[in-house]
Amino acid sequence: LGPDIVSPPVCGNELLEVGEECDCGTPENCQNE
């Protein structure tokens, strides 16, 4: 994916996007506080 690709912030894609507090790889892992 290039910088011109726009995607919504998703917790689980291993990328920390704007608006995300964590991105640990999977939605389950991201629920760990």
UniProtKB/Swiss-Prot annotation:
One example GO MF annotation: metallopeptidase activity
EC class name: hydrolase
Tissue and organ distribution: Expressed by the venom gland.
Sequence intervals crossing the membrane: none
EC numbers, comma separated: 3.4.24.-
Location(s), subcellular: Secreted
Name by which UniProt lists this protein: Zinc metalloproteinase-disintegrin-like moojenin
Annotated organism of origin: Bothrops moojeni (Lance-headed viper)
